[in-house]
């Protein structure tokens, strides 16, 4: 299990525990469960990279303790 922190820069920080084999779509669903927003509206970024739903966290080299940027569309 790894823990990922997502910050939306509006004062909301979400900590999510998941597996490295989970997809970005799975991570968005876990974030949506904590924030109360729909997972379709969530966009996850790191710098200028937008993470796509079907790709696994390990493929993006997302590891324990990493911070991601959380945006809403």
Curated annotation (Swiss-Prot):
Keywords: Cytoplasm, Ubl conjugation pathway. InterPro entries: Hub1/Ubl5, Ubiquitin-like_dom, Ubiquitin-like_domsf. GO terms for cellular component: cytoplasm; nucleus. GO terms for molecular function: protein tag activity. It comes from Drosophila melanogaster. PROSITE patterns: UBIQUITIN_2. Its main location: cytoplasm. It comes from the Eukaryota. This is Ubiquitin-like protein 5. The gene is ubl.
């Amino acid at each position: 299990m790894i823990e990922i922190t997502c910050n939306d820069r509006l004062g909301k920080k979400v900590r999510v525990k998941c597996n490295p084999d989970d997809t970005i779509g799975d991570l968005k669903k876990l974030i949506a469960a904590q924030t109360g927003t729909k997972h379709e509206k969530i966009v996850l970024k790191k710098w200028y990279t937008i993470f796509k739903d079907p790709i696994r966290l390990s493929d993006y080299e997302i590891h324990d303790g990493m911070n991601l940027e959380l945006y809403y569309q």
